[in-house]
Amino acid sequence: MANSTSTQILVEGPRNVVVKFEGVLDTSDLSSTTVLDPTTLSAIDNAPGTLPSRLRIDKIIHNVEDTLSLNLFWDATTPVRIEEITGRGKQEYKDIGGLKNNAGTWSGGTFTPAAGFTGKITATTQGWAASGVLSFSVTLYCVKQV
């Protein structure tokens, strides 16, 4: 058998999107894999007809098997780590304005994307061991952004 991953959009509205990303690893650690691509989503409510180019993460719910860690990244030529996720739990970021895509720079309220910026959220894992089968499940609550 080979590693398998699945991505399921649980909710997609004009502002919010909730995605569940799961994986079963029996061959190796997960190499960079797209979790969510904002350009594949529907238009944003506060900018009619405008497709999102970035996402903000407001909440993460996760269940990652012991010894395994799941790393989330903002995609760019040099990916920017969002968070390393281990164990089981829930992180809420809405009270601090969410986790914003910082694969670029902000100046005077204007965002300038880094080289190779795609807006995607990607994932990798660390900790898989030979002859083992490890799994993870993560649910991301996101807000679409231009």
Predicted features and spans:
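Short, surface-exposed beta-strand/loop "edge" segments at domain boundaries and coil↔beta transitions
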Residues: L25-T33, L68-L70, V80, Q126-S137
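C-terminal interaction-tip segments
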Residues: M1-P14, T125-V146
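Hydrophobic beta-strand residues in large extracellular and virion-surface proteins
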Residues: V19, I57, L70-L72, I82, ...
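Short, surface-exposed beta-strand/strand-loop-strand elements in extracellular ectodomains
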Residues: D66-T86
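Noncatalytic modules at the cell exterior or secretory-pathway interfaces
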Residues: A103-S135
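An anionic, turn-rich surface loop/hairpin at beta-sheet edges
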Residues: V80-W106
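Solvent-exposed, flexible loop/coil segments flanking beta-strands in beta-rich domains
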Residues: M1-G49
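Beta-rich globular "head" domains
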Residues: D37-F73
